[in-house]
Amino acid sequence: MYKEPKNESEYEAELKNAPVAVVYLTATWCGPCRAIAPVFTNISNAPENSKITFFKVDVDALKKLPVCESLQGVPTFIAYRNGEEQERFSGANKVALENMVKKLL
């Protein structure tokens, strides 16, 4: 299951408290984002990934987040360990997302 922060402070607090996290930056108008959304949901719900906190962030709703201000495109996925960015990629790439999650386990 993933979390959908409603504002910047909620996102920052949740991410700070997550030892391991994957952030999915998306937009409602983005076709590739809609295509990869079910994959992200399935991965976030998988029991073997329960030690990872998953976030879905609407970049239009939270555009003041520093991570959103420097964004090149959506969808973008970012892996964090203890608050430090470990990896990032853009695009609706199922295999890249699965590999990112495996590296965090």
Curated annotation (Swiss-Prot):
<dbReference type="GO" id="GO:0015036">
    <property type="term" value="F:disulfide oxidoreductase activity"/>
</dbReference>
<feature type="site" description="Contributes to redox potential value">
    <location>
        <position position="31"/>
    </location>
</feature>
<keyword id="KW-0813">Transport</keyword>
<feature type="domain" description="Thioredoxin">
    <location>
        <begin position="1"/>
        <end position="104"/>
    </location>
</feature>
<feature type="disulfide bond" description="Redox-active">
    <location>
        <begin position="30"/>
        <end position="33"/>
    </location>
</feature>
<feature type="active site" description="Nucleophile">
    <location>
        <position position="30"/>
    </location>
</feature>
<keyword id="KW-1015">Disulfide bond</keyword>
<dbReference type="InterPro" id="IPR005746">
    <property type="entry name" value="Thioredoxin"/>
</dbReference>
<keyword id="KW-0249">Electron transport</keyword>
<dbReference type="InterPro" id="IPR017937">
    <property type="entry name" value="Thioredoxin_CS"/>
</dbReference>
<protein>
    <recommendedName>
        <fullName>Putative thioredoxin-5</fullName>
    </recommendedName>
</protein>
<dbReference type="InterPro" id="IPR013766">
    <property type="entry name" value="Thioredoxin_domain"/>
</dbReference>
<keyword id="KW-0676">Redox-active center</keyword>
<feature type="site" description="Contributes to redox potential value">
    <location>
        <position position="32"/>
    </location>
</feature>
<dbReference type="GO" id="GO:0005829">
    <property type="term" value="C:cytosol"/>
</dbReference>
<dbReference type="InterPro" id="IPR036249">
    <property type="entry name" value="Thioredoxin-like_sf"/>
</dbReference>
<comment type="function">
    <text>Participates in various redox reactions through the reversible oxidation of its active center dithiol to a disulfide and catalyzes dithiol-disulfide exchange reactions.</text>
</comment>
<dbReference type="GO" id="GO:0003756">
    <property type="term" value="F:protein disulfide isomerase activity"/>
</dbReference>
<dbReference type="Pfam" id="PF00085">
    <property type="entry name" value="Thioredoxin"/>
</dbReference>
<dbReference type="GO" id="GO:0015035">
    <property type="term" value="F:protein-disulfide reductase activity"/>
</dbReference>
<comment type="similarity">
    <text>Belongs to the thioredoxin family.</text>
</comment>
<feature type="active site" description="Nucleophile">
    <location>
        <position position="33"/>
    </location>
</feature>
